[in-house]
Amino acid sequence: MHILIYLAGAIVFFAMIMVSVALHEIGHLVPGKIFDVKTTQYMVGFGRTLWSRKRGETEYGIKAVPLGGYCKFIGMYPPDPGSGKLRTVRTGIFQSIADSARQAEWEDILPEDDGRLFYQKKTWQKLIIMFGGPTMNLILAFVTILIVSLSYGLPQSTAQVASVSECVIPIARQTSTDPAQRQCRPGDPQTPAVRAGLRDGDVITVFNGTRVTSWNQLSDLIRDNLDHEARITVRRGDQNVDLKPVHTVITGVESNTDPSKIVQAGFLGFSPAQQMVHGGPVFVVGQLWSMSEQLGNVIIRFPVRVYNTAANLVTGKQRDPNGPMSIVGASRIAGEVASTGDVNVSTKAAQMFLLLGTVNLSLALFNFVPLMPLDGGHIVGALYEAVKRWLARVFGRPDPGHADTAKMLPVAYVVGAVIGISGLILVVADVIDPIKPF
């Protein structure tokens, strides 16, 4: 029964991700149709077509490899300037790639398609079409996390002490992948929290004269204090207690934006308690912003972190629990959540929705990366064209025409290859050495 529940949870969650992908593509398709861009395909997945049906000029279908999707808009790349259509294909490797792509695309373009090609549309129309997909994922992330926030609550760290750390572990051992290295040893110094007399259950109300209103504020106060004196007041039961003044110490702590990165900052030595907080739209927007900061850092370092995942897979080292994963890994976590016996149904549903919201936020942010073939690359191309033509008008120069985004195809192929190889590495890692949620 445990295996069946696990499989059901993983399969259902995988299906929810694919629905998110389908809605992402609808975010492109609908404005494309509204602005009368010729659209020949709307596909969920890649590779061989499993099922399709044609309505009007557009073929709607599902493909064999469920790792994404696409809309095929005709006329993504403009013809060469002055040619009306194409020049003879040239021998330079990069120019040859661009010419070949243009030639392949123009073979499908008919005379009656004039005015309906993507590159011919106004800049604001192109931007709406390209922003549509990631925006759909942002909406899905907002809605799913709002549902969790209103019905179940979101976990928030507080200024209450959950547990006091006994020792200060040297940075060299903190960064070790061996859990035993991150345990206290004889000779490790006591934490400032122990020396100050901080206890489990205490609520820190004042830090160096500043009244504490949230965990984020308290965390920043401690980090910024470095190795200076700390005067702390706590609420213990129904009493306010001034603790013994101590100096915080400078040591390695997790980065606020990248938990996998250790930075040097002030350290007191305790773990904050968690509480479930219910909030509305404004609260959820704040949570999405905080999540975006962390996910953005992951995306910036994505190639490095994928390389580290591959290296750990080859060498047998423990995988970074905060590292990237594929949709296979996310589905496995959903299966673990669904099959956990000591968690009630409402908690499981909340965790699944929260995970789905996080995946959608990740998809949105990743697609905003300003490199082709991602949506962000096409957005940059449209903006570049608009700025170039605007500057020409301002300085009284001839209209430079459409931006030749086909010249960026070599970059698109490299980025596409990196994404494909990275995805394969993460899928293999998620099968062989999956990240454990519990």
Labelled PLM ranges:
Residues 4-109, 113, 363-393:
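Small-residue-rich helix-interface/hinge motifs
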Residues 113-121, 168-170, 182, 254-364, ...:
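Functional transmembrane alpha-helices
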Residues 17-21, 137, 141, 359-367, ...:
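Alpha-helical transmembrane segments of multi-pass membrane proteins
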Residues 23, 34, 58, 69, ...:
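Internal alpha-helical transmembrane segments
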Residues 5, 9-13, 121-130, 351-355:
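Residue-level signature of transmembrane alpha-helical entry/exit and packing/kink sites
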Residues 199, 205, 219-263:
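PDZ-domain C-terminal substructure recognizer with occasional recognition of PDZ-binding tails
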Residues 24, 62, 193, 201-204, ...:
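Terminal peptide-recognition signature
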Residues 189-215:
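Conserved PDZ fold ligand-binding element
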